[in-house]
Amino acid sequence: MRKMKKVMLTTGGTGGHIYPALAVADRLKIKGIEAVFVGSMERMEKDLVPESGHKFIGVDISVPRGLKNIRKYLKAIRTAYKVIKEEKPDAIIGFGNYISVPVIIAGILLRKKIYLQEQNVNIGSANKMFYKIAKMTFLAFDKTYDDIPIKSQSRFKVTGNPLRKEIDGLKYATEREKLGIKPSEKVLLITGGSLGAQEINNIVMKYWEKFCADKNLRIFWATGNNFEQLKKVRKTKKENDRIEPYFNDMLNVMAAADLVVCRAGALTISEIIELEKPAIIIPYGSIKVGQYENAKVLTNYDAAYVFTRDELDESMKRVFEIIRNDEKLKKMRIRLKPLKKPNAAEEIIASLDIWRN
């Protein structure tokens, strides 16, 4: 009997790294390939992975700053080495973050087939360490090629970001009906990501009375956990508005939305593309790096509006300008269609060289 193939996935720390890995793990399982996840025993992956039905092995990993942490990091490499020898994976996929580094290093020492997946336009520091060694690096966006030497581009492949299976089949009309949204109502989703965004919350509060005055505007606002004015907002909101720290049905809400106000995290951008959602984007951080580069994926197609932290008032004015402009919203949705990459997990798995010893 042929031994079941096994793929080791490694990353952690944030949902932006973990959820793409879980999407690939889910697809591996469907194909009869065992997935084993190695991450930090202290970060969110220790709960998310087992809850998703996959094997999780926790390693004591810290950012290697200072002599004590460097020693701890070296110990993590030794632990990962033992784990890989015991698990005998046919391939290892790193999804970025410092948590993946000890596992990738141990995999290289054991001559395992190494693959990488990069969620953002800019390649992260962990993946930068290894992409010249990896058999293949899977990219979310074509724009990443701009920073890759031509001679190295054959070892990269654009697949899109693997997204949670819950996104499959979500339809605008169906989700609106489930949420009890009337045909005459427009839906605005406001989210700063899983941790919230104080800048976004503050500017929404500044315009809150105007939002409340529009009786045919349904607001779904994910504030994050540290929003001090949450109680006040809940007292003044319209009856059908939903104001919560986080929505467990976030993808369903996004599918039902007419417009999204959000950051430019890699998965948020990929979900906006897949669900064809017009967006007002307020990226986190510097205008020259990080989330701004992710946002350009949409602005290059005139499929979103992007505002800096110095343009927050302008961002809200644009919300009121286009939320009822059906023609503008339709054009933005159409422009998102060419960017869709719905089979990312499938393409990644198909590219793995795991059938030869």
Swiss-Prot record:
One GO cellular component term noted in the UniProt record for this chain: plasma membrane
Primary localization: membrane
GO function terms (MF aspect): glycosyltransferase activity; UDP-N-acetyl-D-glucosamine:N-acetylmuramoyl-L-alanyl-D-glutamyl-meso-2,6-diaminopimelyl-D-alanyl-D-alanine-diphosphoundecaprenol 4-beta-N-acetylglucosaminlytransferase activity; undecaprenyldiphospho-muramoylpentapeptide beta-N-acetylglucosaminyltransferase activity
Signal peptide residues on this chain, from the entry's feature table: none
Cell compartment(s), UniProt: Cell inner membrane
Topology in the lipid bilayer: Peripheral membrane protein
Gene3D superfamilies in alphabetical order: Glycogen Phosphorylase B
Catalytic activity reported: di-trans,octa-cis-undecaprenyl diphospho-N-acetyl-alpha-D-muramoyl-L-alanyl-D-glutamyl-meso-2,6-diaminopimeloyl-D-alanyl-D-alanine + UDP-N-acetyl-alpha-D-glucosamine = di-trans,octa-cis-undecaprenyl diphospho-[N-acetyl-alpha-D-glucosaminyl-(1->4)]-N-acetyl-alpha-D-muramoyl-L-alanyl-D-glutamyl-meso-2,6-diaminopimeloyl-D-alanyl-D-alanine + UDP + H(+)
Keyword Membrane annotated: yes
InterPro entries reported for this sequence: GlcNAc_MurG, Glyco_trans_28_C, GlycoTrans_28_N
Pfam families linked to this entry: Glyco_tran_28_C, Glyco_transf_28
Leading EC class: transferase
Metabolic or biological pathway: Cell wall biogenesis; peptidoglycan biosynthesis
GO terms for biological process, alphabetical: carbohydrate metabolic process; cell division; cell wall organization; lipid glycosylation; peptidoglycan biosynthetic process; regulation of cell shape
UniProt keyword list: Cell cycle, Cell division, Cell inner membrane, Cell membrane, Cell shape, Cell wall biogenesis/degradation, Glycosyltransferase, Membrane, Peptidoglycan synthesis, Transferase
EC number: 2.4.1.227
Positions bound to UDP-N-acetyl-alpha-D-glucosamine: 14-16, 120, 164, 194, 291
Cited function: Cell wall formation. Catalyzes the transfer of a GlcNAc subunit on undecaprenyl-pyrophosphoryl-MurNAc-pentapeptide (lipid intermediate I) to form undecaprenyl-pyrophosphoryl-MurNAc-(pentapeptide)GlcNAc (lipid intermediate II).
PANTHER family linked: GLYCOSYLTRANSFERASE, UDP-N-ACETYLGLUCOSAMINE--N-ACETYLMURAMYL-(PENTAPEPTIDE) PYROPHOSPHORYL-UNDECAPRENOL N-ACETYLGLUCOSAMINE TRANSFERASE 1
Family: Belongs to the glycosyltransferase 28 family. MurG subfamily.
Name recorded for this polypeptide: UDP-N-acetylglucosamine--N-acetylmuramyl-(pentapeptide) pyrophosphoryl-undecaprenol N-acetylglucosamine transferase
Provenance organism: Fusobacterium nucleatum subsp. nucleatum (strain ATCC 25586 / DSM 15643 / BCRC 10681 / CIP 101130 / JCM 8532 / KCTC 2640 / LMG 13131 / VPI 4355)
GN (gene name): murG
